[in-house]
Amino acid sequence: MSLNQLKAPRGANRAKKRVGRGQGSGLGKTAGRGGKGQKARSGNMHFEGFEGGQMPLQRRLPKFGFHNIFRRELEEVKVGDLQGLSGVVDPAALKSAGLVRGNRDGVVVLAGGELSSALTVKVHRVTAGARAAIEKAGGKVELIPAPQTMHQKAKAAKKAAAQAK
């Protein structure tokens, strides 16, 4: 077989839908849009969530809560998940083991499961139950500072610039 003989399998490519080209095509006259009305006209359609002028659901329901832009999203790891690891357990080791993705603001270890081997766990946050389980197994916990957010970096730079004057 050569390049000039390559062909898509039957049914892989759908024929182009040619509308408004006579009654015989099945898509003539109104071109598959039905009769008159807003949806038959050219131009923009109404927006998603539009209910024909009726007060839409997203405006009928009350607003509540707020979104904290400074919130830290931590990746969670249970103590039982650390069982297969050895030595020093840090975010890089957890990522290589496939326990975290490494695209959040840090790692938190939660209580859950048993731990039999002594580990040195270096994470951003640890719950009291998880700390007790790690220390009971003969390990130790070291907290590492959370990576700075862009807001914190800007604030620190501004403070340093003010002190330099």
Curated annotation (Swiss-Prot):
<dbReference type="GO" id="GO:0003735">
    <property type="term" value="F:structural constituent of ribosome"/>
</dbReference>
<comment type="similarity">
    <text>Belongs to the universal ribosomal protein uL15 family.</text>
</comment>
<dbReference type="InterPro" id="IPR005749">
    <property type="entry name" value="Ribosomal_uL15_bac-type"/>
</dbReference>
<dbReference type="InterPro" id="IPR030878">
    <property type="entry name" value="Ribosomal_uL15"/>
</dbReference>
<dbReference type="InterPro" id="IPR036227">
    <property type="entry name" value="Ribosomal_uL15/eL18_sf"/>
</dbReference>
<dbReference type="GO" id="GO:0006412">
    <property type="term" value="P:translation"/>
</dbReference>
<dbReference type="InterPro" id="IPR021131">
    <property type="entry name" value="Ribosomal_uL15/eL18"/>
</dbReference>
<keyword id="KW-0689">Ribosomal protein</keyword>
<protein>
    <recommendedName>
        <fullName>Large ribosomal subunit protein uL15</fullName>
    </recommendedName>
</protein>
<comment type="function">
    <text>Binds to the 23S rRNA.</text>
</comment>
<dbReference type="GO" id="GO:0019843">
    <property type="term" value="F:rRNA binding"/>
</dbReference>
<dbReference type="Pfam" id="PF00828">
    <property type="entry name" value="Ribosomal_L27A"/>
</dbReference>
<feature type="region of interest" description="Disordered">
    <location>
        <begin position="1"/>
        <end position="44"/>
    </location>
</feature>
<keyword id="KW-0687">Ribonucleoprotein</keyword>
<keyword id="KW-0699">rRNA-binding</keyword>
<feature type="compositionally biased region" description="Gly residues">
    <location>
        <begin position="21"/>
        <end position="37"/>
    </location>
</feature>
<comment type="subunit">
    <text>Part of the 50S ribosomal subunit.</text>
</comment>
<keyword id="KW-0694">RNA-binding</keyword>
<dbReference type="GO" id="GO:0022625">
    <property type="term" value="C:cytosolic large ribosomal subunit"/>
</dbReference>
